[in-house]
From Swiss-Prot:
The gene is moaC. GO terms for biological process: Mo-molybdopterin cofactor biosynthetic process. Catalyzes the conversion of (8S)-3',8-cyclo-7,8-dihydroguanosine 5'-triphosphate to cyclic pyranopterin monophosphate (cPMP). This is Cyclic pyranopterin monophosphate synthase. It catalyses: (8S)-3',8-cyclo-7,8-dihydroguanosine 5'-triphosphate = cyclic pyranopterin phosphate + diphosphate.
């Protein structure tokens, strides 16, 4: 297998995408944060002392998508044309499901931006609720869809 992020000397490099065609690209990532029922109820009711947990997590996820290249060394800075973070409060399983949809028109995909958005949104929920629930678990972060570019459509069965 040929690793594109390794140069001839075996050192890390950023892949040159200058010859790639610009195409419309989209990536969708999901993840979950499990918590106590009481924590989920308080998020839903808006009674967490630090504020509106989901509003802050939504903004944090968007900011994270926009700043992915600052956190992951080999990611290209990308002009994101759209980013949407959504939440589903699952009271039966005592968790919040997080979904990020990131779009661009460019020479490289936005998979890492979508994954980073979900991760940081989950971390923000953890941060805002840790005073009442240190048993929260962030898990199941994965790419579920990618479209555009040479490799075309990828969809994970979930």
């Amino acid at each position: 297998m040929n690793l594109t992020h390794i140069n001839e000397e075996g050192r890390a490099r950023m892949v040159d995408v200058s010859e790639k065609a610009e195409t419309k690209r989209e990536a969708v990532a999901i993840g979950s944060i499990y918590m106590k029922n009481e924590t989920l109820r308080r998020i839903h009711e808006g009674t967490i002392k630090k504020g509106d947990v989901l509003a802050v997590a939504q903004v944090a996820g968007i900011m994270a998508a926009k700043n992915t290249s600052h956190m992951i060394p080999m990611c290209h800075p990308i002009m994101i044309t759209g980013c949407d973070i959504s939440f589903n409060l699952d009271f039966e399983n005592s968790k919040i499901d997080i979904k990020a949809v990131v779009k661009t028109v460019g020479q490289t995909g936005v998979e890492m931006e979508a994954l980073t958005a979900v991760t940081v949104a989950a971390l923000t929920i953890y941060d805002m609720c840790k005073a009442i629930d240190r048993d929260m678990v962030i898990s199941e972060i994965m790419l579920v869809k990618k479209s555009g570019g040479k490799s075309g459509l990828y969809e994970r069965e979930v």
